[in-house]
Amino acid sequence: EVKLEESGGGLVQPGGSMKLSCVASGFTFSNYWMNWVRQSPEKGLEWVAEIRLKSHNYATHYAESVKGRFTISRDDSKSSVYLQMNNLRAEDTAIYYCSTGFAYWGQGTLVTV
């Protein structure tokens, strides 16, 4: 059974920082690109960031709205992916999900700015 479990959300002041984590199980984590996506009433579902494989030198890509503020990373030894969020804004308020190429999703973690 594939499981993705996010953590690290909560309430943060504008301009603050927060780090989200996602632990995966039930599949070979190191073989999958990983994404963070978010959902808010105002913007709906929005892709945030992607990190590729070791064979791709862990290449990363970001939505324009978060570029320069958010950093995605992964630790294949821990089957985990992370999202470091800096200089948070009110418009970053959303439920954040990790996903494997949109095939599998976690339950989400709420970030309120």
Swiss-Prot record:
CDD domains associated with the record: IgV_H
A single GO cellular-component term on record: extracellular region
Domain spans labelled Ig-like: 1-113
GO term, biological process aspect, one: immunoglobulin mediated immune response
Ribonucleoprotein found in the keyword field: no
Keywords carried by this UniProt record: Adaptive immunity, Disulfide bond, Immunity, Immunoglobulin
Molecular function, one GO term: antigen binding
Entry-linked SMART domains: IG, IGv
Pfam name, any one: V-set
UniProt cross-references to InterPro entries, sorted A to Z: Ig-like_dom, Ig-like_dom_sf, Ig-like_fold, Ig_sub, Ig_V-set, IgHV
Disulfide-bond pairs as recorded: 22-98
Note, other: This chain was isolated from a myeloma protein that binds inulin.
Protein name, as recorded: Ig heavy chain V-III region ABE-47N
Species the sequence originates in: Mus musculus
Classification of source organism: Eukaryota, Metazoa, Chordata, Craniata, Vertebrata
